[in-house]
Design a protein with these regions (language model features):
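Residue-level detector of short, conserved catalytic/binding motifs and their immediate flanks
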Residues: 12, 26, 102-105, 160
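Short beta-strand segments enriched in hydrophobic/aromatic residues
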Residues: 18-20, 111, 166
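Aromatic- and histidine-enriched alpha-helix N-cap/loop-to-helix transition segments
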Residues: 92-103, 112, 153-164
């Protein structure tokens, strides 16, 4: 097929032709012009799906469906441990990684799921975060699902997402509800 010379605008159908029994969409691109001021400055967060023509009720329903599938469905990646912890499993590798944990926290804070956010954070601190030594404040990037570390070394993308999600949590829920999110973010940054 010929390359696309100009990106289509508006609501578009995505067509996938299967040559085998499954399909994976690795990434999608949206050609949207950047705002001159971000959401923190304007108080408005850009909704690219709405810009593409989707109705807000349909967007909300789809996000809810995806969240429920990932966190509660038969193929879920979120698992609760005891009364106050949880982890995100890398199903393919049967382990827990900082990227997955911090992405799960970002999803939780964006969707106002404080209990899930706090559970993930508690698991990460207990099993992944170095409490002393040269990596103090950073996280072992991979653990078994029982919390045993597969590697001691940190992976910076996980740390960056932890910090970002903790700052978002501080803004959304404050710092006096059992976890001082801002202090936790600052500890990682220090």
């Amino acid at each position: 097929s010929a390359p696309v010379k100009k990106s289509p605008t508006g609501l578009q159908d995505l067509k996938i032709t299967l040559k085998s029994g499954q399909a994976e969409v690795d990434w999608m691109i949206f050609d949207a012009k950047p705002w001159t001021a971000g959401g923190m400055q304007t108080g408005k967060y850009r909704n690219l799906l709405a810009k593409l023509g989707y109705q807000q009720a349909n967007i909300d329903a789809k996000l809810n469906d995806v969240f429920n599938a990932l966190f509660y469905g038969p193929n879920k990646v979120y698992f609760e441990v005891g009364d106050d912890m949880g982890y995100i499993s890398d199903i393919k590798n049967n382990d827990v990684r900082t990227e997955g944990m911090s992405y799960g926290m970002m999803i939780a804070v964006q969707l106002d799921k404080k209990d899930i956010f706090d559970r993930l954070w508690r698991w990460a601190v207990k099993y992944m975060q170095h409490q002393e030594g040269t990596h103090e404040g950073y996280f072992a990037w991979s653990c078994k699902i029982d919390g045993t570390r597969n590697s001691q070394g940190p992976a910076s993308d996980g740390e960056l997402y932890y910090v970002t999600s903790l700052i978002f949590a501080s803004n959304r829920w404050g710092n006096d509800t059992g976890i001082n999110y801002l202090a936790e973010a600052q500890r990682i940054l220090n």
